[in-house]
Amino acid sequence: MTTNEKLIKSADRVKDHGEVFTPKWVVDKMIDQPEIAAKVRSLTATFLEPSAGEGAFLVEILDRKLKYAAELSKSAHEFGSYALMALSTLYGIELLEDNVEMLVMNMKDTFSDNYRELMADLYKKKPDQKVYNSAKVIIRANMAQGDALKKIDAYGNPIIFSEWQPIGKTKVQRTEYTFEAIVNGDGPTGTVHHAIEEIPLDLFPDEEPETFGETSTRHFLPCKWTDIYKEKIE
């Protein structure tokens, strides 16, 4: 553990919420386990962290997945799609608001820094703004403030999960389901149990909390990975 690495924020938070952060050396050791490392080197294998904190695990996995996406890419455009595909496989739920804010910021920073640097190093090009815009939507959809055990978000509404299903190499189909529907076996495919999460609406003050009725699914039009930000609904 590094000398400046804090494992707790306060004794009260440990007492009230059991909050203890994982040191980086432990994160690295866990991700280096063969069964985990193999999934990290996959653009479609998904990870859910039900108590995500500030994103120690998710950020490290994202960093490694983006580098793997770069290895597979043969062009700047392909790298943009693969980078978004890698990002779409990572999901987090966190109870505490300040942690969720840091989680979202850390995921955004990790994606943007890696994408910008790899674009410059590999292709001598500037980042595509559409990739940034689409990454923001994915992170907003995949990082939820809520209670994973109760399956509710910060507003008491059902946690919503998005399945990002690749269509070939360049397109994606997004489908949203309540966590309850997934737990009950009503998911759209046999892979949704890998977990696909969503919307900490309070993190984006220009958006209003959404109240969910009886409908358990919402369908988005298939689109290019780089057009996810348009969020066109079927």
Stretch-by-stretch model annotation:
Residues T2-E234:
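SAM-dependent methyltransferase catalytic region
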